[in-house]
From Swiss-Prot:
It catalyses: (S)-4-amino-5-oxopentanoate + tRNA(Glu) + NADP(+) = L-glutamyl-tRNA(Glu) + NADPH + H(+). The keyword S-adenosyl-L-methionine does not apply. The record marks H91 as: Important for activity. Possesses an unusual extended V-shaped dimeric structure with each monomer consisting of three distinct domains arranged along a curved 'spinal' alpha-helix. The N-terminal catalytic domain specifically recognizes the glutamate moiety of the substrate. The second domain is the NADPH-binding domain, and the third C-terminal domain is responsible for dimerization. This is Glutamyl-tRNA reductase. The keyword Protein transport does not apply. One of its GO terms (molecular function) is glutamyl-tRNA reductase activity. It is an enzyme of class 1 (oxidoreductase). NADP(+) binds at G181, A182, G183, E184, T185, I186.
Length: 432
């Protein structure tokens, strides 16, 4: 089996394709089950965020993985990147460290990678190969963040959106802000907004208790999602980041809100993939919509400023990839030896137990030893004998050459006799 990663992200695919490729909620366990059902796949994990969807797998080949992704989201094959073995390891290390993120060094991605590992593990999609890789990934990401400043003072998508809101509404302390959702992105936005002392903070979520918790932490007001349309006109700024499969805010709703506001401008940030706000809202006068792709341009300055720390982190990753691959190759080389030793040990134990039972039953010792030696020879030599016979029939020179090296033919060769130890006595002459 080969290690593969296939995926698309904010650099290779537009937001409309990323939202079709995303896995959310109950779709993720079902997708893992579907993947594991493929005969070419032994292990799998899925990482799905607003900026990327990636499939990690131990599989015979990549074509079956591409076909599976195409079935999930037709038309994405032209946007996919694909890595295998060492380059797949490097890619995951870079992703978890934040080096492949829209916001360089952002900390949220490591938690999302851990979530992907936990879900795959909980649903039986991980084996020793991917589990070992993810465990090493967490260690490498932690070291890169500890030994460099790649994660220092991180600028998140949420903080970038809040900064743009501050630039658009010079006095956020006189504005009403509506947050839709209660996940990590909205939590970060709420934190930055409360620090900006917005006049009024509304938080709408499908689970009201989650909205109430967030509202109590940041001095806001919690709303059930069913009240969203009724309160939309009150918002000068809207931030939305949920896992909904369909838009929560429609063009019609925003048009109605603008009329109620007497055309007073609204600023909307859609931080979700799939999108929470209909794209056509941006066509409305007095409505200004930003998506995660728009925010990428806004964070480019931050990316340039963190390049030195990123280069240091890249050097750490290069070293750790080399060490991981070396360890993996050593383990792979040892595997046939371990299987051979285990086969020999189990065969010996089985036949020895049988011989002891025969002795216990009174069978002559010489006869038991003769049968034991004969059985051991047959049992141990049968697999290589059968393999060599097939190799000869199929003209497999590689295997027959290997057999010559394992069992060299030396006419007249005899094993040296077992040396008899020399017993020293007090009367013995000392060695000259």
């Amino acid at each position: 089996m080969t290690l593969w990663v296939l995926g698309l992200n904010h650099q290779t695919a537009p937001v409309d394709l990323r939202e079709r490729a995303a896995f959310a909620g109950d779709a993720l366990p079902r997708a893992l089950e579907s993947l594991r059902a493929l005969p070419q796949v032994s292990e799998a994990a899925l990482l799905s965020t607003c900026n990327r969807t990636e499939l990690y797998a131990m599989a015979d080949e990549a074509r079956s993985l591409v076909n599976w992704l195409e079935t999930h989201a037709p038309g994405l094959s032209g946007y996919l990147y694909q890595h295998q073995e060492a380059e797949a390891v490097r890619h995951l290390f870079r992703v978890a460290t934040g080096l492949d993120s829209m916001v360089l060094g952002e900390p949220q991605i490591l938690g999302q990678v851990k979530d992907a590992w936990a879900v795959a593990r909980a649903h039986g999609a991980l084996g020793s190969g991917l589990d070992r890789l993810f465990q090493q990934t967490f260690s490498v990401a932690k070291r890169a963040r500890t030994d460099t400043r790649v994660g220092a003072n991180p600028v998140s998508v949420a903080s970038t959106a809040v900064r743009l809101a501050q630039e658009s509404f010079a006095r956020l302390n006189e504005s009403t802000v509506l947050l839709i959702g209660a996940g990590e992105t909205i939590e970060l936005a709420a934190k930055h907004l409360s620090e900006s002392r917005v006049r009024r903070l509304l938080i709408a979520n499908r689970t009201l208790a989650h909205a109430q918790t967030l509202a109590s932490q940041h001095g806001g007001y919690a709303l059930p999602l069913t009240d969203l349309e009724r309160h939309l006109a009150e918002a000068d700024v809207v931030f939305s980041a949920t896992a909904a499969r369909e838009p929560l805010v429609t063009r019609v709703q925003v048009e109605q809100a603008l009329r109620a506001r007497k055309r007073k401008p609204m600023l909307l940030f859609d931080l979700a993939v799939p999108r929470d706000i209909e794209a056509s809202v941006d066509e409305l006068s007095d409505a200004y919509l930003y998506t995660v792709d728009d925010l990428e341009r806004a964070v480019e300055d931050n990316r340039r400023g963190r390049r030195e720390a990123a280069d240091q982190a890249e050097a750490i990753i290069d070293l750790q990839v080399a060490r991981y691959v070396e360890t993996l190759q050593a383990t792979t080389r040892q595997a046939p030896l371990k299987r051979l030793r285990a086969f020999g040990d189990s065969t010996r134990d089985e036949l020895l137990a049988k011989a002891r039972q025969q002795l216990h039953n009174g069978k002559p010792t010489d006869e038991v030893l003769e049968q034991l030696a004969h059985a051991l020879t047959n049992r141990l030599l049968h697999p290589p004998t059968a393999a060599l016979r097939d190799a000869a029939l199929n003209n497999d020179l590689e295997l027959t050459t290997a057999a010559d090296r394992l069992f060299p033919e030396k006419p007249g060769y005899q094993h040296p006799p077992i040396a008899t130890p020399i017993v020293r006595t007090d009367d013995a002459d000392p060695a000259p």
